UniProtKB/Swiss-Prot annotation:
Keywords (A to Z) from UniProt: Host Golgi apparatus, Host membrane, Host-virus interaction, Inhibition of host innate immune response by virus, Membrane, Transmembrane, Transmembrane helix, Viral immunoevasion
Transmembrane intervals: 36-56, 68-88, 89-109
Subcellular location: Host membrane; Host Golgi apparatus
Keyword Membrane: yes
BP GO terms, sorted: symbiont-mediated suppression of host innate immune response; symbiont-mediated suppression of host type I interferon-mediated signaling pathway
CoV 3a-like viroporin TM domain span: 32-127
Record's protein name: Non-structural protein ORF5
Boundaries of every CoV 3a-like viroporin CD domain copy: 131-188
Primary role: Seems to play a role in the inhibition of host innate immune repsonse.
Gene from which the chain derives: ORF5
InterPro entries, alphabetized: a/bCoV_VIROPORIN_3A-like_CD (IPR046446), a/bCoV_VIROPORIN_3A-like_TM (IPR046445), MERS-CoV-like_ORF5 (IPR044323)
Main location: host cell
Taxonomic source organism: Middle East respiratory syndrome-related coronavirus (isolate United Kingdom/H123990006/2012)
Amino acid sequence: MAFSASLFKPVQLVPVSPAFHRIESTDSIVFTYIPASGYVAALAVNVCLIPLLLLLRQDTCRRSIIRTMVLYFLVLYNFLLAIVLVNGVHYPTGSCLIAFLVILIILWFVDRIRFCLMLNSYIPLFDMRSHFIRVSTVSSHGMVPVIHTKPLFIRNFDQRCSCSRCFYLHSSTYIECTYISRFSKISLVSVTDFSLNGNVSTVFVPATRDSVPLHIIAPSSLIV
């Protein structure tokens, strides 16, 4: 129902005369409007998708990709809706919606493409997180988005995602570790190791000559 363009087909109100009720005349159109069912359907789609977009967590790569796909679908649906409104009778409403969506799309993709060029990876197009950990070993390198905003990384500790990229990050030995955000790129160095339930974890923090206070609280479960 919410995806049918027929819901937004303009309806014309024409005065009916008893003598000429079978004769249609375009000159006698009093008012043209779009049925309320179209707006109800459009509102229902947005009411369902926007809370879903806000409730989806980004603690794993899969969930973050799903959230990004929901965002793309929401923008695409409203863009198609705006095109239908422009082609119909609600030209001002459709034009304003198209202008808003075009500006939003431009700002979004400029930010994502900048991340892609900075990281030399396509991951930012499908993962809407804006903080990344990039590591390099002797023979390979890897990069994953993260949810924390502080420039630190603890290898083999509190691993919430089990995808191949996260597994690589938490199981390899690095010669270089970098924290990358929207406006900064910080090199991290290993400062200490600690053991929890037989698993050895390494703490990476920004390189500094000053002392770095660390407070590590062990989680209730450790997944490796």
